[in-house]
Amino acid sequence: MASVVTITLNAAYDLVGRLNRIQLGEVNTVETLGLFPAGKGINVAKVLKDLGVNVAVGGFLGKDNSADFEQMFNQHGLEDKFHRVDGKTRINVKITETEADVTDLNFLGYQISPQVWQQFVTDSLAYCLNYDIVAVCGSLPRGVSPELFADWLNQLHQAGVKVVLDSSNAALTAGLKAKPWLVKPNHRELEAWVGHPLNSLEEIIAAAQQLKAEGIENVIISMGAKGSLWINNEGVLKAEPAQCENVVSTVGAGDSMVAGLIYGFEKGLSKTETLAFATAVSAFAVSQSNVGVSDLSLLDPILEKVQITMIEG
């Protein structure tokens, strides 16, 4: 029986490529790194399964091109609770440049009708009660308003479900109203939420404290190569990985961090151990084009070099 379920409302195929520098208005030749069945919650689930945690996956998939997702679920042993909807699951393009900047071209996908959404709400409220943690990840599909999303999350909250929310923009703002147990915006998403640039660690911490003041028990901020922060009632903890010498793609690094955090919670690790492990999993992710941990021993040398600092508390 799975102990965690991840929800991906707006799944996608990720077409991942690499080139030196995008030239706007010109023809660009891109090295193809792969086409992967993805979506933030699915990425989280893949990493968790590699780490030895049983996971279920839910959300929406387009009927017309679901075969690769279904094959991947079978290969990874993921319990499939996805609702199939009319149309195709979208394709998102992720281009990594030599300097490790990533440009995302995220396309609109399937349209969710009111009837399909209500069926999902009814079904998910029933099955989510069976899991220790429900990770809700990614953007909202067409047809699901921020208000509908917040109402669903609030019903999960009222039912006592422990929700991890990893989203951005309108979905993040709406989701906060339901007071999820943990939220994990990255630096840019935090800037978008607070409404202005955050140019120093102090400013990032202050903004994260504002987020916590919304009634959020745990706030995790991922900051790329600069590490991550964990803000809760115990104080502010900072984790910093060693510099990665071989950055292939940063796609999925944030999802890998969410998986590492959930792994720590499931295994009963301390706050320090959990943040260090999640930071190591995220740092490992940038060394590959796909998401996952094929060999757990590869995490050990990265984990040994993660530096943990208590800033407040």
UniProtKB/Swiss-Prot annotation:
GO (cellular component) term, any one: cytosol
Single Gene Ontology MF annotation: phosphofructokinase activity
Reactions accelerated catalytically: beta-D-fructose 1-phosphate + ATP = beta-D-fructose 1,6-bisphosphate + ADP + H(+)
Keywords: ATP-binding, Kinase, Nucleotide-binding, Transferase
Positions annotated to bind ATP: 222-227, 254-255
Membership in a protein family: Belongs to the carbohydrate kinase PfkB family.
UniProt xrefs under PANTHER family: 1-PHOSPHOFRUCTOKINASE (PTHR46566:SF5), 1-PHOSPHOFRUCTOKINASE-RELATED (PTHR46566)
Name this polypeptide is given: 1-phosphofructokinase
Provenance organism: Haemophilus influenzae (strain ATCC 51907 / DSM 11121 / KW20 / Rd)
Originating gene: fruK
